[in-house]
Design a protein with these regions (language model features):
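Phosphopantetheine-dependent thiolation modules in NRPS/PKS and related acyl-activating systems
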Residues: 2-38, 46-48, 52-53, 57-87
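Two-component histidine kinase catalytic core, primarily the HATPase_c
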Residues: 42
Length: 87
């Protein structure tokens, strides 16, 4: 999976948990919470959806890695690729 595909996965999850948010102008380098009306429960929903939909575990200590789309892609792309290699 590429980093761009990984960013799209995160955006798809956000679109599902916060359907009223306009995701068309999200800047990948800026913290998601600074751009969108996401609270801590929404953030936990993102983590839970990554686990439910994609079997990606994000330990609490790594939550800050999901702050922006860029940092999410950096963190999640190797995890997605490791899962793909196992299948």
């Amino acid at each position: 999976m590429t980093k761009d595909e990984c960013k799209q996965v995160v955006l798809d999850i956000i679109a599902d948990i916060a359907p009223d948010e306009d995701l068309s102008n999200v800047k990948p380098e800026v913290r998601l919470r600074d751009q969108l009306q996401l609270d801590s429960m929404d953030f936990l929903d993102i983590v839970m959806e990554l686990r439910k939909r994609h079997s990606i575990e994000v330990p609490e200590a790594d939550y800050q890695q999901l702050a922006s789309l860029d940092s999410s892609a950096e963190y999640l792309t190797p995890k997605f690729n490791a899962l793909a290699a196992k299948s």
